[in-house]
Amino acid sequence: MVKNQAQKRGVKRKQVKNIPSGVVHVKATFNNTIVTITDPAGNVISWASAGKVGYSGSRKSSAFAATVAAQDAAKAAMSSGLKEVEVGLKGTGAGRESAVRALISSGLIVSVIRDETPVPHNGCRPRKRRRV
């Protein structure tokens, strides 16, 4: 009557949740693209960034890196039963549109695409202009 280690300690196994719809948050900056997939309540199902999928330096800011990151996050979310998503885009980086295209091509049904880019109503004073 030998029990395995998880049963001895009373550790619960992680349950696979079945979440049919969710929200994809795409944050596209000039240096990186972060794709986070959540359930409607805001709990994170999966996430990926251009840096997480293996790109570094200036290659993180490319549209192709955003495509790979979106496919990686979508694949992980679809394993938990995700089928339909709403997309919220934030930022003005190169990976905005390519991340949405990657989500569609990976098999997710995109119902809504929202632009959630934060725009100040004349808030804080911006940094000095960069002279190259």
Curated annotation (Swiss-Prot):
Establish whether keyword Cytoplasm is in the entry.
no
The superkingdom of the source organism is Bacteria
Q: Do you know which Gene3D superfamilies this protein is assigned to?
A: Ribosomal protein S11
Keywords carried by this UniProt record: Ribonucleoprotein, Ribosomal protein, RNA-binding, rRNA-binding
Q: Name one Pfam family in it.
A: Ribosomal_S11
Q: Which example biological process does GO assign this protein?
A: translation
InterPro entries per UniProt: Ribosomal_uS11 (IPR001971), Ribosomal_uS11_bac-type (IPR019981), Ribosomal_uS11_CS (IPR018102), Ribosomal_uS11_sf (IPR036967)
UniProt cross-references to NCBIfam families, sorted A to Z: PRK05309.1, uS11_bact
Q: Which PANTHER family match?
A: 40S RIBOSOMAL PROTEIN S14/30S RIBOSOMAL PROTEIN S11
Q: Summarize subunit and interaction data from the UniProt record for this chain.
A: Part of the 30S ribosomal subunit. Interacts with proteins S7 and S18. Binds to IF-3.
Family affiliation = Belongs to the universal ribosomal protein uS11 family.
Protein name per UniProt: Small ribosomal subunit protein uS11
Q: Which gene encodes it?
A: rpsK
